[in-house]
UniProtKB/Swiss-Prot annotation:
Protein name: Disease resistance protein RPS6
Organism: Arabidopsis thaliana (Mouse-ear cress)
Pfam families assigned to the protein according to its UniProt record, in alphabetical order: LRR_3, NB-ARC, TIR, WHD_ROQ1
Chain positions found as N-acetylmethionine: 1
Miscellaneous comment in the UniProt entry for this protein: Ecotype cv. Columbia does not respond with a hypersensitive response to hopA1.
Keyword tags: Acetylation, ATP-binding, Hydrolase, Leucine-rich repeat, NAD, Nucleotide-binding, Plant defense, Repeat
Length: 1127
């Protein structure tokens, strides 16, 4: 046999070659096994179902000879295949020739039957040997005996297959001496990153591949790269991690030079090769490096070095390196990756809220979740950090061990940047290395965060900042992102931009942007602004009063952007404005003027708006904007919504590029000026609820108009000529539709009150209409059958038509997915006009039953029958709706029958397991319904909300508090489940509805006081009613390996504390009691779709992810046991 040294020095292409009979294991054991190998970054040979023949395929032979370990899966039909047996011969040959390691697995097979070729396995083997030579049979027998004598894995001796697979994978790692470092195992979310990177790295490929890791500063790119480097290094002949430290150390003797220098480049290559070959003195010359590493399989990580010269010097060409090499480039600059033809890019995204909270808790508390009394504070701090991992870790470490009072005092200060965070983020800004890009960054941080990209480009069009190129550079460097045409900058980067501006001068009026309330108030009140100020942004919700000096803007004649705004237009907060009558100046260079709740009747008389691009003055006191005609060629958007005193619109004849005009709720406006006929680019006109508007100039045909809203214009006497190509029209509560209306391209139409939905109207509508809303018309009694001509109609809303009795029959609107007939109080028959409806609202109708035919609505997700006072029964066929997520029968005061089960066995087949967690039923104020029977008869997972003041006796454990203790209970299964009930009291609420979350957490305790906590089980509910509510829901806590480790071995967890809590900070809600019924007491629980034998949470994948935790906990238990024995 070859020595281990020769074996280990061999350059293997694969770590593992699996030999198996596909008939037995390909789609079962093998698929799980290969998935676990991939997860652990173990490279396996995959045959991709090579067509089998009698002789061994050359590709397979190459795979065997170039694999470090052969895993032979003996199964029932393994010996039936000459192919498998020939594979085995080659494996034994490699084992003898160069020390290939072999691991046998006996899958539902007695090892002795393989070893001796007896039993069913022996019979199958003898059948295969027919017509074979004696020599061939002998060699097969010897190979079977040889491999079967090796200590391997017998599946019968394992409790579950998942555990065995994980053990085999760890065994392989151990045999290869590539056990991964534990340095990164506790990092939250790191396994997800490694799994995603694994697919990009494609380690089983022999190509030399370059992969990029891209994302903003502080998001964890380097951490991911180091975790990968730690885990993968031992699988390569050489590995080098190149970062700023490596470069600076390598270049110490060349301080002051740069990499363009020839000698510098050689010196850097020499340092690189010294790492590759682990030698100090290496002599090189031009072109030597690529020749020296050409046959070396190397792992190279270049971290956060956006220096083209570094990449050119060390990894300019992939062909420099040996087969299977991987080069990982970590950067904030996506352009840098594209410029170097790196197409495989992993974008590192911000963690979810749950992961962010866990990251913070690891840093602050050294555990995954906060103590109960720190829950809200921890969530607030995580929010302040904007989910940025760097911020979460820094803030967590700063607050670790500090009392709650200090946390509360510190919260206001967390708005600023911590020194370490600021320093890290500042590197990203300095890396722009371009004054124009830096200026755009500051503009976005101080003025434009959250604005539309198209608006920003227009507002900066004359700035000489090369906006298109600059925005692309900022996106590439992860300093901003673009979503749905909106520009977003992370809160910490935004704070960095503001901090950079603050350092421009100790005098706020000398800075380019004013962003802090105190500074703005000081500058405006004391008239200290200068020509250096380009923009001001002020949220008026932050102050109760504002003093503005009469000449405050005269010194700021370069001011381009003025944003005095509120995010809470729906709240009538009073702000005391101190604006003198002599205030008569705004800078004429203004391009953006947003001044919500502007307190004066008119803009300053000396204001010249010629440069305006966007004018937004919602809920102002304006009666008019200005007098006369101004050149407004740059104006694109005018928004005066809610300016109830506005009596006139200025002459807009020179606003030829205006695209959006929003005047809704300008209730004093009587007419539009005739100059709107010149607005040839206007595409959105909103005049809704201008309830004094009487006339629109005749003869106006706005050819570009796409959206028109005249809803609530109840005095409108004349219509403008509506363009035929308009796609969205709302003429609710207006005059009758013109008889000559032809809307060829209309997509959405909203009508109400006096308009009649008659056949003549239907002929005016385009068959392409997708949404039709018709409401508040008491004279409307029937829907014309011609509605079937709207063959693309998706949403039909006929609301509050109290004399509507029926809908047409015999039609099927195939495209209809949403139907709303709410408050049609005379409607008695259940609608039957489409079988594809997913959302059906029949609330406050006169319908008396949910019929058997409800099962035809197979796609129904939401059913609302709230307030159907005539409803008597709900057909059990509703239980067959496998997509149903929510049904509301609240205030159905006559409802007496609501059987939800049908045949539980049938529903188990019909309904998917993962559907039940979302099915919610509301039976509040259904006083004639036997609610106890409804609860008791539920044999599958539901969430119910009912009327009640106390937990029913059906629940065997009850309390008036929020927790229940079960002192003597055996926890020995792979799950813990029960039916829970809480009493929620709703005192009052001002909104239409109130939503709340109930979380359930279990603590499992043993007789020594050891314990572990489950993950929280969340539930989300909505109610519109006051009083006491019973909320009933089933809770499942599947135990992955992380938890089952606690349940086996020496300790018995026989005590469970169950905690219910409202997670909403809402004083109107109170949790006044709770109860549980253990799963063994719930009828037919074992037959539920969510029962443990098919519960998604109890699966092999989740078990496989917990191996390191399981080993660590076993060691902890052993240490604890030793202590107990030594007492």
């Amino acid at each position: 046999m070859a020595s281990s040294s020769s074996s280990s020095s061999r350059n293997w292409s694969y770590h593992v070659f699996p030999s198996f009979s596909g008939e037995d294991v390909r789609n079962t054991f093998l698929s799980h096994f290969l998935k676990e190998l991939d997860r652990k970054l173990i490279i396996s040979f995959k045959d991709n179902e090579i067509e089998r023949s009698q002789s061994l395929d050359p590709e397979l032979k190459h795979g065997i000879r170039n694999s470090r370990i052969a895993v032979v899966v003996f199964s029932k039909t393994y010996a039936s295949s000459s192919w498998c047996l020939n594979e085995l011969l080659e494996i034994v040959k490699c084992k003898k020739e160069f020390g290939q390691l072999v691991i046998p697995i006996f899958y539902n097979l007695d090892p002795s039957h393989v070893r001796k070729q007896t039993g069913d396995f022996g019979k199958i083997f003898e059948k295969t040997c027919r017509n074979k030579t004696v020599d061939e049979k002998i060699r097969w027998k010897e190979a079977l005996t040889d491999v079967a004598n090796i200590l391997g894995y017998h599946i019968v001796t394992w409790d579950n297959e998942a555990s065995m697979i994980e053990e085999i994978a760890n065994d392989i790692l151990g045999k290869m001496n590539i056990s991964p470092s534990n340095d990164f195992e506790d990092l939250v979310g790191i396994e997800d990153h490694i799994t995603k990177m694994s697919s990009l790295l494609h380690l089983e490929s022999e190509e030399v591949r370059m992969v990029g890791i891209w994302g903003p500063s502080g998001i964890g790119k380097t951490t991911i790269a180091r975790a990968l480097f730690s885990r993968l290094s031992c699988q390569f002949q050489s590995s080098v991690f190149i970062d700023k430290v490596f470069i600076s150390k390598s270049m110490e003797v060349y301080s002051g030079a740069n990499l363009v220098d020839y000698n510098m480049k050689l010196h850097l290559q020499r340092a690189f090769l010294a790492e590759i070959f682990d030698k100090k003195d290496i002599k090189i010359h031009v072109g030597a490096m690529e020749k020296m590493v050409k046959h070396r399989k190397a792992l190279i990580v270049i971290d956060d070095l956006d220096d083209q010269d570094v990449l050119d010097a060390l990894a300019d060409q992939t062909q420099w390196f040996g087969s299977g090499s991987r080069i990982i480039v970590v950067t904030e600059n996506k352009h840098f990756l594209r410029a170097n033809r790196i197409d495989h890019i992993y974008k590192v995204c911000l963690p979810s809220n749950a992961l962010a909270l866990e990251m913070f808790c690891r840093s602050a508390f050294k555990k995954n979740s906060p103590p109960d009394d720190f829950l809200e504070l921890s969530s607030e701090v995580a929010l302040r950090a904007g989910n940025l991992p760097l911020g979460l870790n820094v803030l967590g470490s700063n607050l670790r061990g500090i009392n709650k009072g200090y946390w509360i005092d510190m919260l206001p200060r967390l708005q600023g940047l911590d020194g370490k965070i600021g320093k890290t983020l500042r590197v990203s800004y300095d890396g722009l290395n371009n004054r124009k890009d830096e200026a755009i960054f500051r503009h976005i941080a101080c003025i434009f965060n959250g604005e539309k990209v198209s608006d920003i480009k227009l507002l900066l069009a004359n700035s000489n900042l090369d906006v298109n190129i600059g925005l692309k550079n900022l996106v590439d460097r992860s300093l901003i992102c673009e979503r749905f045409n909106t520009l977003e900058m992370h809160s910490l980067l935004q704070e960095l931009g503001k901090e950079i501006v603050r350092t421009q001068s100790n005098q706020p009026g000398e800075r380019e942007f004013l962003v802090d309330l105190k500074d703005i108030c000081d500058v405006l009140e004391h008239n200290t602004g200068t020509k250096k100020v380009l923009g001001i942004t002020l949220d008026i919700d932050e102050t109760d009063e504002l003093h503005i000096h009469e000449s405050s803007f005269k010194g700021m004649h370069n001011l381009l952007f003025l944003k005095i705004y509120t995010k809470k237009l729906d709240q009538k907060k009073k702000v005391r404005w101190h604006l003198p009558e002599r205030f008569d100046y705004l800078p004429s260079r203004l391009r953006l003027l947003r001044f919500d709740r502007y307190p004066s009747k008119c803009l300053p008389s000396n204001f010249h708006p010629e440069n305006l691009v966007k004018l937004q003055m919602q809920q102002s006191k304006l009666e008019k904007l200005w007098d006369g005609v101004h050149s407004l060629a740059g104006l694109r958007n005018m928004d005066l919504r809610g300016s109830r005193n506005l009596k006139e619109i200025p002459d807009l004849s020179m606003a030829t590029n205006l695209e959006t005009l929003k005047l809704s709720s300008c209730s004093s406006l009587v007419e539009l000026p005739s100059s709107i006929q010149y607005l040839n680019k206007l595409n959105d006109l909103d005049m809704s609820y201008c309830d004094h508007l009487e006339t629109i100039p005749s003869g106006v045909n706005l050819k570009s108009l796409d959206r028109l809203n005249l809803s609530g214009c109840s005095r409108l006497k004349s219509f403008l000529d509506i363009p035929t190509n308009i796609s969205w029209l709302d003429i609710g509560q207006t005059a009758d539709i013109p008889s000559n209306l032809r809307l060829q391209n209309l997509d959405e139409l909203i009508l109400c009150e006096r308009v009649q939905l008659r056949t003549p109207l239907m002929t005016m509508l385009s068959p392409t209409l997708t949404r039709l809303t018709f409401s508040n018309n008491p004279s409307f009694v029937e829907v014309p059958s011609s509605i079937q001509n709207l063959y693309q109609l998706e949403h039909l809303e006929i609301m509050n038509c109290r004399n509507l009795v029926t809908l047409p029959t015999g039609i099927n609107l195939d495209s209809l997915i949403s139907l709303d007939l709410s408050h049609c109080s005379q409607l008695k028959t259940f609608p039957d006009i489409s079988t594809n409806i997913s959302d059906l609202n029949l609330s406050y109708t006169a319908i008396e039953e949910v019929p058997l035919s409800i099962e035809k609505l197979s796609l129904l997700c939401y059913l609302d029958m709230n307030g159907c006072s005539n409803l008597l029964c709900v057909s059990p066929n509703i239980s067959k709706l496998k997509h149903l997520e929510r049904a509301d029968f609240s205030d159905c005061v006559e409802l007496t029958e609501a059987s939800w089960n049908g045949s539980s066995s049938e529903m188990v087949k019909l309904l998917p397991a993962d559907n039940f967690s979302t099915v919610k039923l509301n039976f509040i104020n259904c006083f004639k319904l036997d609610l106890t029977a409804l609860i008791q008869n539920q044999t599958f997972f539901m969430q119910l909300i009912l009327t009640g003041e106390e937990v029913p006796s059906y629940f065997t454990h009850r309390t008036s508090g929020d927790s229940i203790s079960l002192p003597h209970i055996s926890v020995c299964q792979s799950f813990f489940s029960f039916r829970g009930c809480t009493v929620i009291d709703v005192d009052s609420f001002s909104t239409i509805s109130v939503s709340f979350d109930i979380e359930v957490c279990c603590r499992f305790i043993d007789r020594f006081g050891n314990h572990f906590d489950s993950t929280d089980f969340p539930g989300y509910f909505i109610t519109t009613k006051l009083g006491g509510h019973l909320v009933v829901f089933d809770c499942y806590f599947p135990f992955n390996e992380e938890f089952t480790t606690f349940l086996d071995g020496q300790f018995n967890y026989d005590h469970v504390d169950i905690q219910f809590r409202l997670t909403n900070d809402n004083s109107q809600l109170k949790l006044k009691g709770c109860g549980i019924l253990l799963s063994e007491d719930v009828p037919s629980l074992d037959n539920r779709p969510c029962s443990p034998n098919i519960l998604p949470g109890v699966c092999e994948d989740s078990a496989l992810e917990r191996r390191s935790f399981r080993t660590k906990m076993r060691m902890m238990r052993m240490r604890l046991l030793k202590k107990l024995l030594n007492r």
